[in-house]
């Protein structure tokens, strides 16, 4: 569908915890219906992911899920979302990603049945389609592995399916380094948008076929967040990064035009624009999150979020 009008009529309605189109998913969790829930991101410590270490990998995720759920119950959280961002090797071998998805789902189910903790599991396969140069986005082994990763993770119990897609990034990256706004606009507004339309038609179709899974959303992490980080390092002008940040909203909107319903990805800082246009719930992060991108914009980011998240934290004892 194309959006011809704003779903949110004014700033007084663009508030945290409420969306015109709430999303119900997982274990009795409704996002955007009056409460902001934590979304917890996590990852492995430095560890090779291979057959020889797979038992250790699984044990880390068992610990992560057990600890997060136990803390959520102890704090009497009204609900929680876990996000499992597959590492590249887990998308390369789709069965591995699905196995971890099943582990996390089992812990959430147990907490819901034992303590009534409402929850959902977001699963985000890695977009591995840019392995070749130029990348093969719609055919080839990488796409088949990515497609199978989505399918198996849905089957294993993923509630919200998302991705950080990379179509058009090879043109956009060069545009950033040369300060070429025409290349940036072409990468974001033409190449990325076309890839998003194609990709999200398929993600939404797989979610619909899988029953209870919902198509969450995409993020311009590989585009606008790259610009933001380079600007923080004084490698390109902050004004250019700000323009790219605003431009990225048009790209991420394409997912919602092709079946996404939210909640959007936390690292999609363009989320407030998406929420205002679509009315779908969004996940955000900012300076007051335990771990997040360096940014002075945390209060703005949290002003209209429906999930409050963090950048992935390694499973290490501090």
Language-model region placement:
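N-terminal small/glycine-rich loop or linker at the start of catalytic domains
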Residues: 3, 8-14, 19-56, 117-137, ...
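Terminal or standalone catalytic/regulatory effector modules within metabolic enzymes
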Residues: 48-49, 79-91
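Helix-rich catalytic cores of soluble enzyme domains
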Residues: 56-66, 70-73, 86-318
């Amino acid at each position: 569908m194309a959006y011809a009008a704003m779903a949110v009529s004014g700033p007084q309605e663009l508030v945290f915890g409420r969306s015109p189109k709430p999303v119900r998913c997982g274990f009795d969790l409704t996002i955007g219906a009056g409460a902001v829930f934590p979304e917890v991101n996590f990852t492995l410590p430095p560890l090779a992911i291979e057959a020889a270490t797979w038992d250790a990998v699984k044990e880390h995720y068992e610990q992560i899920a057990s600890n997060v759920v136990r803390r959520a119950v102890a704090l009497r959280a009204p609900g929680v979302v876990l996000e499992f961002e597959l590492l590249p090797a887990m998308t390369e071998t789709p069965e591995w990603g699905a196995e971890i998805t099943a582990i996390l789902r089992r812990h959430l189910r147990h907490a819901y049945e034992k303590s009534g903790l409402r929850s959902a599991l977001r699963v985000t396969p890695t977009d591995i389609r840019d392995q070749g140069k130029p990348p093969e986005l719609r055919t080839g082994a990488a796409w088949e592995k990515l497609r199978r990763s989505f399918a198996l993770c849905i089957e294993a119990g993923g509630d919200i399916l998302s991705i950080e897609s990379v179509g058009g990034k090879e043109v956009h990256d060069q545009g950033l380094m040369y300060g070429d706004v025409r290349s940036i606009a072409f990468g974001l507004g033409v190449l990325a948008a076309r890839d998003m339309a194609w990709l999200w038609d398929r993600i939404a179709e797989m979610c619909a076929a899988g029953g209870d899974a919902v198509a969450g959303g995409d993020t311009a992490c590989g585009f606008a967040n790259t610009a933001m980080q380079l600007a923080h390092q004084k490698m390109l002008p902050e004004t250019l990064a700000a323009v790219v940040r605003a431009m990225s909203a048009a790209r991420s909107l394409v997912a919602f035009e092709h079946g996404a319903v939210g909640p959007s990805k936390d690292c999609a800082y363009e989320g407030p624009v998406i929420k205002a246009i679509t009315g779908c719930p969004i996940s955000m992060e900012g300076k007051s999150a335990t771990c997040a991108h360096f940014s002075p914009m945390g209060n703005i980011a949290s002003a209209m979020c429906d999930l409050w998240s963090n950048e992935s934290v390694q499973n290490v004892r501090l």
